[in-house]
């Protein structure tokens, strides 16, 4: 039975060596492979105590991977789905809000690059940014700034 626990721990370390995982995500992955008598929660506690598993590192990693392509609401929604606590979400939201306009502008530039010539095209560009999770305020500011740059 001890060998199964080591196997489960080895599997957890292999997952964590590839990228950071949230406690909830890693627990879900390990539960699929757990045998009767394996205590996944105890293993997760052990990994957290040994600093192999960290919610804050996972949050930073996810924000870093997603920030260049997505808006605040999409990133925060994904963090929430991974079980990140509300206090951490509040801190992350405050950090993300400072550069949402710049990120929206960069995404717009990569996708479109030119200012919409008619209302239909403008609506299409705005919908694209909204689907990426950017706030209406950031989208409006990015579109206005793009229009000023074209003039």
UniProtKB/Swiss-Prot annotation:
The keyword S-adenosyl-L-methionine does not apply. It holds the Pfam family RecX_HTH3. It is found in: Cytoplasm. InterPro entries: RecX_HTH_1st, RecX_HTH_3rd, Regulatory_RecX, WH-like_DNA-bd_sf. Keywords: Cytoplasm. GO terms for biological process: regulation of DNA repair. One of its GO terms (cellular component) is cytoplasm. The keyword Acetylation does not apply. Belongs to the RecX family. Modulates RecA activity. HAMAP family: RecX (MF_01114). This is Regulatory protein RecX. It comes from Janthinobacterium sp. (strain Marseille).
């Amino acid at each position: 039975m001890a060998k199964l626990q080591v196997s489960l721990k080895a599997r957890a370390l292999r997952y964590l060596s590839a990228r950071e995982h949230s406690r909830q995500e890693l627990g879900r992955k390990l539960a699929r492979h757990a045998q009767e008598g394996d205590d996944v929660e105890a293993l997760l506690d052990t990994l957290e105590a040994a600093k192999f598993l960290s919610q804050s590192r996972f949050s930073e990693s996810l924000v870093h991977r997603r920030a260049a392509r997505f808006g605040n609401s999409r990133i925060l929604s994904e963090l929430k789905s991974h079980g990140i606590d509300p206090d951490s979400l509040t801190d992350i939201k405050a950090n993300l809000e400072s550069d949402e306009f710049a990120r929206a502008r960069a995404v717009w530039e990569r996708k479109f690059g030119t200012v919409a010539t008619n209302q239909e095209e403008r609506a299409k560009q705005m919908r694209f940014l909204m689907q990426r999770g950017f706030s209406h305020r950031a989208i409006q500011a990015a579109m206005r700034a793009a229009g000023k740059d074209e003039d």
